[in-house]
Every structure is written in structure tokens, then in C-alpha cells.
Amino acid sequence: MLKTSEKIFSETPSIITKEEGLKILNGVIPLTTCLDKAFQERNRYFENKVRIHILDNIKNGYCPEDCGYCAQRKNANSGVQEYPMKSEQEIYEDAVQAKKNGAYRFCMVTSGTGPNRLTTEKLASTIQRITDELNMKVCLSAGLLDIEKAQVLKEAGLDRYNHNLNTSENHYSEICDTHTYLQRAQTLDSVSKAGIGMCSGVIVGMGESFQDIVDVAFQLKSFRVISIPVNFFIPVKGHTIKNPSVLTPELCVRILCMFRLINPDSEIRIAAGREGHLRSLSATALFAANSLFSSGYLNVKGSEILETVAMIRDAGFVPELSNGEILPENFGTESFYSEKNFPELYKFKKF
């Protein structure tokens, strides 16, 4: 059965001030000190557990919005494969596979400004089936949402609703001009009033300042967001971000530490860009973050599940399942040590 004790709202005050957040990002505070303080809070609320989330892109393209970072935006000419929303059965089968792969939560993502009434009802039906038949937590990302639609999704059993702020209010007009920061904030307000856990995070590396990163971290805190995905900008074909920032692995870890210390009891998730920006520090980042995505992102490939699980275990952490249990130690071992991956192990195999 699903755990019922998971919090909907963040309840713990920030550990640091805005000024201290800037010192972390500017490198004034040693990285080891940042990691030590971040790990203390991470361990306090999440112990040594890591939640693996798997995305299902249930509708790709056909989007009227003009978010500069997105390969699905209007007029992007990015070459992504466009397709309408998957059927309930297709999404359900994807959820079954995600559960087999050890996902803590199944994340459904659809392109577009926001769902209409009929789409909301279809999504609600799918969510209810997944939660009832698979006992699996579900997160939905479907754009702008009002309170009425949020309540329909809540009644269907939706666990989390994702709607990222992406950047600070001051910087928002630099990345999108078809909707406003206020509209995104209003969606979070609707989700909150419906009693759904808020999942809202950022995309770092879109030309923002360190002050912008600190400001949005505290804005998320003010909303009491319980789940914060931290994306590192990937320059996909067709993007319109004018001055992408240079992100080093160390800076990415510092950003995750800062988010942990501002939002101590929130789930801090390493999201898109992990493989390319954190690189050899991916495992180190888990001392600040307690969650990550596996098996790819919306239109970009990512580490597969066996590689992700191995990294988590190698760093001394354990993957957590929706029911609170731990992924078995022998998960994927047989296929991981296959002849394809390690041919030298089979060199002297007798027939």
C-alpha cells in the first residue's frame, strides 16, 4: 500500500539567509563545508534513501507557448517527434514498466498551456487507475491549472502536481513571453488550495544571476513547496536562450546544497542535465539531493535505470519505493553483469 505519512507542505524554516546563499554560490564557503551542512539536513529528513522518478512524456509538441528553453515550443523547428496524448491504456502500461524499474513516483508530462475540462477528466481517470491498481504515487505536469481542475485531480488520487517557476520573477520575461510568472504562481496557489503536494523547481543556466537563483529558491520556500526539481539547462536544438550560463560540476553541487539549506525538509531532485553538467560529481550531489530522474527526460536521453541504481548504491545510499520499502539489493544484478556489458567475464565460459 502507499505510504500516507508523506507531507504535502514544507514545514521547516530555512537554515541560511539570502546572503549566505550567495556566499555558497560565489565559492566563498568551501564545498566540503556546504556538503556537510546540506547532508546533515538531508539525512535528518530522508536518511540514506533516494527516490527514483521516471518520466512519461504522454503528449509531445503541438504547444502554443514560447518558453525559450523548450524543444516543444511553438516555431522551435527542433525536429522532435510530435504526437497527441497517449491513450489511458498506453499510459497505464508505461506506469507498469516504471514500477518494475523501481520508480518511487510515476511522472506524467503533457505539453500545452493547460488541460481543458475533457482532458482533465481523462487524466483523472488514468491517475485513479494507476493509484488503485498499482498502488503507485503519481505526479502530473500539465501546465496552468485552476482550482476546479485541481480538485478533480485531487479526488482521483493525484499525489503531486508539477509546475516549475523555472527562474526568478525578475528574470522570467527573458525566457518566456506567452505567459507570466504570476500565472505560474497562481497555478501553485490552486494546487495548494486543493491539497495536492506541490512540485515546483527551476532550470539553472539560462543567463540568470546568482541573485536570481537565490531569490527563486526562497520564493519556492514561501509557497511551502515539498518537491523541488533542479534542472540544469540543456541547449536543445531550437532554444532561444540568449546567454546560457557556464555550469561547472562544482557549481551544480553548490546550487543543490543551497536549495537543501533553504528548503531543508523538501525533496530536492536532480533533474535534467545531471549527466552532462554534474558528470563525475553525480554521486556526490546525492549528499544534498535525495531524489533524481532516471531513464531520460522529455526530449533528451539520460542514464538508464541499472546505471542509476548502481550509482546510488555505490555512494552508500539506497533506492526507496512508493510503499516505503527498499529496492532489493539484487535488483538488476543478473542483467547488469550480462555478457554484453562485461564480455571479459564470459571469456572462458564453458559450453
Curated annotation (Swiss-Prot):
Its EC number is 2.8.1.6
Q: Which reaction does it catalyse?
A: (4R,5S)-dethiobiotin + (sulfur carrier)-SH + 2 reduced [2Fe-2S]-[ferredoxin] + 2 S-adenosyl-L-methionine = (sulfur carrier)-H + biotin + 2 5'-deoxyadenosine + 2 L-methionine + 2 oxidized [2Fe-2S]-[ferredoxin]
Q: In its UniProt entry, what is this protein called? A: Biotin synthase
The residues covered by the Radical SAM core domain are 48-265
Q: Which Pfam families match?
A: BATS, Radical_SAM
Q: Which GO terms describe its biological process?
A: biotin biosynthetic process
User: Sorted alphabetically, which NCBIfam families does this protein's record hold?
Assistant: bioB (TIGR00433)
Q: Which molecular function GO terms apply here?
A: 2 iron, 2 sulfur cluster binding; 4 iron, 4 sulfur cluster binding; biotin synthase activity; iron ion binding
Q: Which organism was this protein described from? A: Leptospira interrogans serogroup Icterohaemorrhagiae serovar copenhageni (strain Fiocruz L1-130)
Q: In which pathway does it act?
A: Cofactor biosynthesis; biotin biosynthesis; biotin from 7,8-diaminononanoate: step 2/2
Q: Which UniProt keywords apply?
A: 2Fe-2S, 4Fe-4S, Biotin biosynthesis, Iron, Iron-sulfur, Metal-binding, S-adenosyl-L-methionine, Transferase
Residues given in the record as [2Fe-2S] cluster binding sites = 107, 139, 199, 269
What HAMAP family does the annotation carry?
Answer: BioB
Q: Which cofactor does it need?
A: [4Fe-4S] cluster; [2Fe-2S] cluster
Q: How does it assemble?
A: Homodimer.
Q: Which PROSITE patterns match?
A: RADICAL_SAM (PS51918)
**Which InterPro entries has this protein been placed in?**
Aldolase_TIM (IPR013785), BATS_dom (IPR010722), Biotin_synth/BioAB (IPR002684), Biotin_synthase (IPR024177), Elp3/MiaA/NifB-like_rSAM (IPR006638), rSAM (IPR007197)
Describe how the cofactor binds. Answer: Binds 1 [4Fe-4S] cluster. The cluster is coordinated with 3 cysteines and an exchangeable S-adenosyl-L-methionine. Binds 1 [2Fe-2S] cluster. The cluster is coordinated with 3 cysteines and 1 arginine.
Q: What does this protein do?
A: Catalyzes the conversion of dethiobiotin (DTB) to biotin by the insertion of a sulfur atom into dethiobiotin via a radical-based mechanism.
Family named by the database record: Belongs to the radical SAM superfamily. Biotin synthase family.
**Which residues are noted in the entry as [4Fe-4S] cluster-binding?**
63, 67, 70
